[in-house]
Amino acid sequence: MNDIFIIAGPTASGKSELAMLLAQKFNGVIINADSMQIYKEIPIITASPSISEKQQIDHYLYNYVSIFHSDINELNSFDNISQSKVNADYNNINLQQSITKHLTDRRYSVAKYVQEACKIIRSVIHALKLPIVVGGSGMYINALVYGIHHIPEITLEIRMQVQDLYKKLTKQEFYQKLIDLDPISKNYIHSSDAQRMIRAYEVVLQTNKSIFSYHNSKLVSPLEGYNVKKIILLPDRQLLYQNCNQRFAKLATNGELVDEIIKIKPYYDHISISAKKALGINEIISYLNQELTIEEAITIAQQKIRQYAKRQLTWFRNQTINGYTLHYQSMSELYKTQVNDVFFN
């Protein structure tokens, strides 16, 4: 057995459900390729697989990276804490002192994802099972399929130096300093993109080279030699928007989601920039701060999720793939015609 399935597509398109179906049919194992579902403290708001789903089928690379700059779980567990105890328990922690003391260079990267995913894929194939990679993060999927440019590791000292500088300056001031050091980055990075600005600044400070100078090297696919089958889900836009709205409304009216955000809210300033991009977090925090009603929070979050889904839909439509592209107007059409025709006939 040398096959690998990759199921990709926009959020709320039905990827996880299809992955479960195929895993049950073909003795498969599910491997995450969603940049938000890696985080362990926010499984509900990121719509990660449920405990029941994980019990039915083996899932890997879900909910295993901390959203915090350091591993706050060493200080106080996020599991099994009742809502009434949250504030009292967390107020007893000298968080600033602990975070400074335990700060690590555990920031996740695409390169780390590819390394972990390839290791799991090899193990799954060795066990004569089918690896099914599932997600909507195009950067993860492309890096896994086509390869990634290797950039030298950034030291913890440089990372802290850049983080401190970013906090002291406005975004525009930081952007100007980056352009002064790395003029090439002006052609590729916008001043509103904090994550990419910080990354580019770290690289030029560490290596004295632009991050984009490393992009000239030839890419080699980590999955070379395997039979990779890609399945891209492209639902009708109105169906996609409907799925986005329904899923977040269902999550937001679930008390467990609010509890999840209550637990991380006191430490918001210590959450990594990438984790703060998880859709819905900021709206639920605004609700908890009494800045929005729950209805307003849901409406604003739904709008942002639809906008994100639209961008994903456009991106996946423009991809040239060696595999299957499934177009459908309803979820029943996806399963009764498209999936049946491709996998079960």
UniProtKB/Swiss-Prot annotation:
Q: What is the lineage of its organism?
A: Bacteria, Pseudomonadati, Pseudomonadota, Alphaproteobacteria, Rickettsiales
Binding-site positions, ATP = G9, P10, T11, A12, S13, G14, K15, S16
UniProt keyword annotation of Membrane present? no
HAMAP family hit by this protein:
IPP_trans
Q: Give the source species.
A: Orientia tsutsugamushi (strain Ikeda) (Rickettsia tsutsugamushi)
> Which protein is depicted?
tRNA dimethylallyltransferase
Q: What does this protein do?
A: Catalyzes the transfer of a dimethylallyl group onto the adenine at position 37 in tRNAs that read codons beginning with uridine, leading to the formation of N6-(dimethylallyl)adenosine (i(6)A).
**Binding, substrate:** T11, A12, S13, G14, K15, S16
Give the molecular function GO annotations.
ATP binding; tRNA dimethylallyltransferase activity
Listed EC numbers: 2.5.1.75
Q: Where is this site: Interaction with substrate tRNA?
A: S137, R159
Q: Which reaction does it catalyse?
A: adenosine(37) in tRNA + dimethylallyl diphosphate = N(6)-dimethylallyladenosine(37) in tRNA + diphosphate
Query: Hey, which family's this protein in?
Result: Belongs to the IPP transferase family.
